[in-house]
């Protein structure tokens, strides 16, 4: 959690994290005044919506989000931006007018499809870019034990057993899925 260095973290982790979003963003902006700055926020985090909205208030250019399906990220970003512009008045079309880029982390065709369809249906928007994390990335990717075995990523010697060509087929499917929504929204959606 971003606020773990704050002496008050153990008493009030939420407040420590919200304050740290601003202080870390300020430090990063001093280092890179013209750079693109963002936050990687886990969708499985207990206060996910609050953290996303606070990152927008801090001035984030992009929110990258995985560790679960960030299906409501567009809502949190658009509402935070609308409140910055208009106070508590949420006008129609706020999801199409956002400035903060949205970048979900996906590991499968299915996760890319769920996110893109949900964002399209609920918020009339699509990702600005998509990050792929494969079975060797570790972390919170949601691969089943069977999938890890299929990709050869379930052993201590992954560098020898990993079946890159098998996962590359999944990557091609993710790119194809994202392209459908890029075409629909008439915009480029890089897949990283």
Regions of interest found by a model, annotated:
Residues 1-185:
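Active-site entrance/lid segments in N-terminal catalytic domains of soluble metabolic enzymes
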Residues 187-192:
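Glycine-rich adenosine-cofactor-binding loop
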């Amino acid at each position: 959690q971003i606020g773990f260095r704050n002496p008050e973290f153990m008493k009030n982790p939420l407040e420590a994290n919200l304050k740290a979003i601003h202080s870390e963003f300020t430090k990063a902006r001093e280092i890179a005044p013209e750079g693109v700055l963002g936050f990687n926020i886990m969708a499985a985090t207990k206060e996910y919506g609050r953290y996303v909205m606070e990152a927008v208030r801090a001035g984030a250019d992009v929110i990258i989000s995985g560790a679960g399906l960030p299906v409501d990220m567009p809502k949190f970003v658009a509402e935070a931006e609308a409140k910055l512009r208009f106070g508590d008045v949420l006008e129609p079309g706020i999801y199409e007018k956002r400035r903060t880029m949205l970048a979900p982390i996906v590991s499968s065709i299915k996760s890319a499809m769920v996110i893109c369809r949900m964002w399209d249906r609920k918020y009339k928007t699509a990702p600005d870019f998509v990050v792929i994390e494969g079975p060797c990335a570790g972390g919170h990717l949601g691969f089943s034990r069977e999938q890890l075995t299929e990709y050869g990523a379930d052993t201590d010697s992954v560098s020898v057993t990993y079946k890159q060509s098998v996962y590359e087929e999944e990557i091609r499917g993710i790119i194809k899925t994202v392209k459908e929504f890029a075409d629909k929204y008439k915009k480029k959606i890089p897949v990283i």
